A protein has these predicted regions:
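N-terminal secretory signal peptides and thylakoid transit peptides that target proteins
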Residues: 5-29, 35-36
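Short beta-strand->loop
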Residues: 123-132, 183, 220-233
């Protein structure tokens, strides 16, 4: 089954202005080299243990839970053990990838772009763990009773978000699109959930399944709008260091085969996928099965009829995902948010290994890996 480690996260937050938040977010990207200077290489090296950073509370990385609890990696990945390291947001995983403390990271689009832009350790985005037109990570939720009915009503208010995440990027995009001024308060996602449930904050941006816990499970809030209203997609991504891909290609490729199998389970056997995912103690302790099911399979219908989630893997065949990762996302993070000081080179977004995994898997399974691998 593998071991599990956890990186603790603070529960509190501090009120900061938009400008100070942007400056701090920029330091996140630019300061990575300071935090990990002198560290090179990957965690795998000559070891037979593969270290994987995953997010137990992130619906667009639910495939990782299916791989873990279904032990799907055992058939495809030539290692003796997988060490599972749980995180609550992508930024710690970016640091761990750069410092060589982990071999593979599941994360949202914002930290994935930051990973690809770093200049210390070559990292590649190798595939998607999930995709939607703003229905998973680009979510604005308001507490019950809050006098907020439209994006314009956010002007002059305090808005809560976890800094450095895909939801943070969406908030900045909304501010830019609406021409509003807000006070951004940086809070860890669990603190956001607690404060929305208690009514101590009015509005927050976040991701699933945490937002669904507030809205559906606890009945303490409502979705105000999503990324679909701004044609802002969101996605989960898998990031690997070049060292793993080049020195242990069968391990890297094998993991992508396991990912494809997990997507097949999610797409064709939803009850089995839920059975496996709910074995994650951190998830099942806080969320009921119905809530998790809703985040994966039940459309929000807040901004049109956008699908809740697509179980896609190859970003190169899904134009909005490709544009977000390689064009609009990096440009926004560099020019508007000052989070990165360069846009990632094109070779940092690599779908070739996934193509190889799909081709090989076609001869190994009875289902069509291209259905979950390539086609939108």
């Amino acid at each position: 089954m593998g071991r599990t480690d956890r990186t603790p996260s603070a529960d509190g937050g501090a009120g900061v202005s938009r400008r100070r938040t942007l400056r701090a977010a920029g330091a996140l990207g630019a300061g990575l080299s300071v935090a990990v200077s002198g560290c090179l290489g990957g965690a795998f090296g000559g070891s037979r243990t593969l270290t994987v950073d995953y997010h137990p509370y992130y619906s667009q990385a639910f495939s990782a839970l299916v791989i873990r609890h279904g032990e799907l990696w055992e058939e495809h990945v030539p290692v003796d053990e997988v060490e599972w390291h749980a995180v609550l947001q992508g930024a710690p995983t970016v640091n761990r990838l750069i410092s060589g403390d982990t071999d593979l990271g599941y994360m949202g689009d914002n930290p994935a772009i930051i990973s690809a832009a770093n200049t210390d350790t070559p990292l590649r985005v190798v595939g998607l763990s999930g995709y939607s037109m703003g229905q998973q990570g680009n979510l604005c939720v308001v507490a019950d009773g809050a006098d907020v009915d439209a994006p314009a009503d956010l002007d002059g208010r305090t808005v809560n978000v976890t800094q450095g995440t895909l939801s943070h990027r969406f908030l900045l995009a909304v501010i830019d699109a609406e021409g509003i001024d807000v006070e951004i308060r940086d809070q860890e996602i669990n603190a956001i959930v607690t404060n929305l449930r208690e009514g101590s904050i009015d509005v927050a941006f976040g991701w699933e399944p945490s937002m669904s816990r507030v809205v559906n499970q606890d009945g303490a809030g409502r979705y105000l709008f999503t990324g679909a209203a701004y044609e802002e997609p969101d996605l989960g991504a898998m990031v690997m260091p070049d060292s793993l891909i080049e020195e242990r290609p069968e391990v890297a490729k094998g993991w992508l085969k396991a990912e494809l199998e997990a997507k097949h389970v999610l797409e064709t056997e939803p009850e089995r996928a839920l059975d496996l995912g709910m074995r994650e103690e951190d998830l099942s302790r806080d969320l009921d099965r119905e809530t998790v099911h809703a985040t994966l399979y039940e459309d929000l219908n807040v901004d049109g009829d956008a699908a809740r989630q697509r179980f896609y893997t190859d970003f190169s065949t899904i134009e909005p995902a490709r544009e977000l990762l390689t064009e609009t996302g990096p440009a926004f993070l560099r020019e508007e948010a000052a989070v990165i000081d360069r846009e990632p080179p094109a070779d940092r977004f690599d779908s070739e290994l996934l193509a190889e995994a799909i081709a090989e898997l076609e001869d190994e399974v009875e289902w069509d890996p291209r259905q979950v691998g390539e086609r939108p």
